[in-house]
């Protein structure tokens, strides 16, 4: 099987980690161009033997979420529309793929939140992320070959897993050990 990694950040470390494990089922690991999330999704040809792994940071393509991160008012209807657009592009890709794997979005260390009110208010970052993941799940519920992966198991919010220098140098938001989980 061919595994194609698609992201809006650098997944070269994940590729190297997968290749070093010599997984028998994976013949080839390919990383799409850095920062070319939508371009990669739209340009990939039909390959019903390929598994596509799409890992994104929501603030890079869900503009209403990015507004929420900087404490601007958001419109829920636009947020839902943006999530649906993202989901539709993944559903279209699934028609050209064996399987599509999509890690859920999670609250990352650099997100400013509203503390104990984060789940109470509509603008709470934790609440918005949860709502976005639920919306993705609803969009994908009837698509047999799209799988949401619970990324909270990866502990991405821990200081142990982040490295600012790595981000600035290579555009990888996580320590290499995240990719070996």
Language model features with spans:
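Extracellular glycan-modifying ectodomains
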Residues: 1-181
